[in-house]
């Protein structure tokens, strides 16, 4: 018999905590990346010094397998696609089509502003030249992460893509065949059988494969991973760009008495099954709903495949129910929490959702569960965690673009503003800056 699940409760009714107090009171887990940096730094340094040879040694140590080459042969990509379950292939094709439709509308166009007659500034959008897309192994297989990383990069016009995913002992040192098939379906030709911190380091520094072929370094690394991947990203940031330091997945649900407790429970469980550190948070003004959700969690947990993992996540310090006076207070709570995934299951859900200011993605109403966004909504599921949605966005076409300002001024336009340039340069005690302008209009003495 399954023991009853009762989410820990934080009661904010009748209180008006400050923002700092609110953030401190809310359930929050996360991981301490600093605690593993001393383990990861030697891995990164070894790969920097010895390239693929070091990465393969760490792969043997951590994954228990050494691939014949880091780069997966093209024949293996083709074979994985040929052998892919037809239902999974159809689902991936639908996911790709929807993601491409959404991300196509994110393309940026160059803009030119005439500041003054003869003086223009153009913002030109240029894709990152080469990108490394990390797809984790671990508790599950994530072909959907291949889609979510590759589609915006391709849409942005990135010319060179490499997917890195851990080698699997069960598959002869290759990444999981579903990962390979997804890459092939997207037209990705370069996949590396390397995972963990050593993958991030090899993507950053490059090296030489066992067959002598070059493994070119990338300019940007995206994609989620465990704490060691995150630590390696931190250590390599600057040498390469990174999308974010991803933490455990999280869902917050803002719900009132109109919500179906079975739906709320199912959605909380769906994210809890990712990881024992996953966060599932309910914010509600209805004690009756909170009680009903606890009962529904208990009932559903009895038939969930990964019951122990889910139970551990739901009963961890990162999960719980927050009781509020009303939906307005609930909105303040969810904005302070800044969830990776936020569901709105209230009356007039669209109007409530329009008031949200901090969330990685918002799922509105009873028929937009987070699972839809994970796979087939068309939105991207690589989203900011650990409260970073207060200042950061999810993966998009913009992630893979750089805006370059192109400044063009005629002689007359420069002469017209020269006095202002000189005044500001002198105010900052940088007279050579002003001289670089005036020299164009007067002879040197």
UniProtKB/Swiss-Prot annotation:
Cofactor annotation comment: Binds 1 zinc ion per subunit.
Binding site for substrate: 249, 271, 274, 341, 374, 428, 433
Enzyme Commission number, as recorded: 1.1.1.23
Residues engaged in binding NAD(+): 134, 198, 226
Annotated PROSITE patterns: HISOL_DEHYDROGENASE
UniProt binding sites for Zn(2+): 271, 274, 374, 433
Protein's UniProt name: Histidinol dehydrogenase
SUPFAM superfamilies to which the protein is assigned, alphabetical: ALDH-like (SSF53720)
Gene: hisD
InterPro entries: Ald_DH/histidinol_DH, Histidinol_DH_CS, Histidinol_DH_monofunct, Hstdl_DH
Biological role stated in the UniProt entry: Catalyzes the sequential NAD-dependent oxidations of L-histidinol to L-histidinaldehyde and then to L-histidine.
Sorted UniProt keywords: Amino-acid biosynthesis, Histidine biosynthesis, Metal-binding, NAD, Oxidoreductase, Zinc
Active site: 340 (proton acceptor), 341 (proton acceptor)
GO CC aspect terms: cytosol
Keyword Amino-acid biosynthesis tagged: yes
């Amino acid at each position: 018999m399954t023991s009853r699940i009762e989410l820990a409760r934080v009661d904010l009714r009748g209180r008006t905590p400050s923002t700092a107090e609110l953030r401190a009171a809310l359930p929050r887990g996360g991981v301490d990346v600093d605690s593993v940096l001393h383990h990861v730094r030697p891995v990164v340094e070894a790969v920097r010094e010895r390239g693929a040879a070091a990465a393969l040694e760490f792969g043997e140590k951590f994954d228990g397998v050494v691939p014949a080459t880091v780069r997966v042969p093209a024949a293996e990509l083709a074979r994985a696609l040929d052998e892919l379950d037809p239902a999974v292939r159809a689902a991936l094709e639908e996911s790709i089509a929807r993601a491409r439709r959404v991300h196509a509308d994110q393309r940026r166009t160059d803009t030119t502003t005439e500041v003054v007659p003869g003086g223009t500034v153009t913002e030109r959008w240029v894709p990152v030249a080469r990108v490394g897309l990390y797809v984790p192994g671990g508790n599950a297989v994530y072909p959907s992460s291949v889609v979510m990383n590759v589609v915006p990069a391709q849409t942005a016009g990135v010319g060179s893509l490499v997917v890195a995913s851990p080698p699997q002992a069960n598959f002869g040192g290759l990444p999981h065949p579903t990962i390979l098939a997804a890459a092939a379906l997207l037209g990705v030709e370069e996949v590396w059988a390397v995972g963990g911190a050593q993958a991030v380091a090899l993507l950053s520094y490059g090296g030489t494969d066992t067959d002598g072929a070059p493994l070119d370094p990338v300019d940007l690394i995206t994609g989620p991973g465990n704490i060691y991947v995150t630590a390696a990203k931190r250590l390599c940031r600057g040498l390469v760009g990174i999308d974010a330091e991803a933490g455990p997945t999280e869902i917050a649900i803002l719900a009132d008495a109109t919500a179906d407790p079975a739906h709320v429970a199912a959605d909380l469980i769906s994210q809890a099954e990712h990881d024992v550190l996953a966060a599932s948070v309910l914010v509600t003004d209805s004690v009756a709903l909170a009680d009903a959700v606890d009962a529904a969690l208990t009932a559903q947990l009895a038939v969930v495949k990964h019951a122990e993992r889910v139970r551990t996540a739901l009963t961890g310090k990162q999960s719980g129910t927050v009781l509020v006076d009303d939906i307005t207070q609930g909105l303040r709570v969810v904005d302070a929490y800044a969830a990776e995934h936020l569901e709105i299951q209230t009356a007039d859900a669209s109007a409530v959702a329009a008031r949200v200011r901090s969330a990685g993605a918002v799922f509105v109403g009873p028929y937009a569960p987070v699972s839809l966004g994970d796979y087939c909504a068309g939105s991207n599921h690589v989203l900011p965690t650990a409260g970073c949605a207060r200042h950061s966005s999810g993966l998009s076409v913009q992630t893979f673009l750089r805006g370059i300002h192109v400044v063009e001024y005629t002689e007359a336009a420069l002469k017209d503003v020269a006095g202002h340039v000189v005044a500001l340069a002198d105010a900052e005690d940088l007279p050579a800056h002003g001289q670089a302008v005036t020299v164009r209009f007067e002879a040197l003495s």
